[in-house]
Amino acid sequence: MSDYSATLNLSAPETLNLLLSRRSGSAKRLTGPGPNADQLRRIIAAGIRVPDHGKLAPWRFIVFEGEGRARMGNILAECIAGERDTSPERIEQERNRFMRAPVVIGVVSRVREQIPIPVWEQELSSGAVCMTMLFAAHAMGFVANWITEWCAYHPQVLARVGLKPTEKIAGYIYIGHPAEPLEDRPRPAVDAITTRF
């Protein structure tokens, strides 16, 4: 163990096992309870400890919980109802989309253009936020899923949840507990995707 790791009071094997054991749980199969206010704050606090070239904080958060999930569902239902050939079943499905988990966090990417920091790096920082929040939720004993779906790209939905035209949804993080045991999916072999230069 290095001198630096000793100052953090971390067990290297336990920390690495935490990273290696993380897996997503289907948003359709999450149940309560979700994180409380303090846990939610800590998940977000962990999320923002990511690489951020230029200290721009090119992200912000929208928390959907309680009745806020139902309000979001109404927005989705209204927006999808305006689409061609939308069935009543589909409208109801969208109305319940954000009810699938106790808490959903929208991670908003808000890049600044025409500055020396590349837009791509700012967007990658938002992706790192999403991933770090998944690890934080996992460390607290929750299951989380990072997804986008159509509602991350629909202009009317984005406007109605307060996004500016220059902002994007990097992901919706669904957090809860698994309603059934999780099964890990196959992962690529490290050697098959690694080259040495």
Question: Which positions does each model-derived feature cover?
Answer:
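Small-aliphatic-rich amphipathic alpha-helix that forms the alpha element of a beta-alpha
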Residues: 47, 105, 111-160
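Phosphate/diphosphate-binding glycine-rich loops and adjacent basic-rich segments that engage nucleotide
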Residues: 184-197
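N-terminal amphipathic, basic helical "cap/leader" segment at the start of enzyme domains
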Residues: 1-100, 197
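Short, charged/polar surface micro-motifs in flexible loops or helix N-caps
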Residues: 67-71, 78, 111-113, 155, ...
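Conserved hydrophobic/aromatic beta-strand scaffold that supports enzyme active sites
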Residues: 18, 104-108, 172-174, 194
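Short Asp/Glu-rich motifs
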Residues: 73, 156-157, 163-164
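A glycine-rich helix N-cap at a beta->alpha junction
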Residues: 161-186
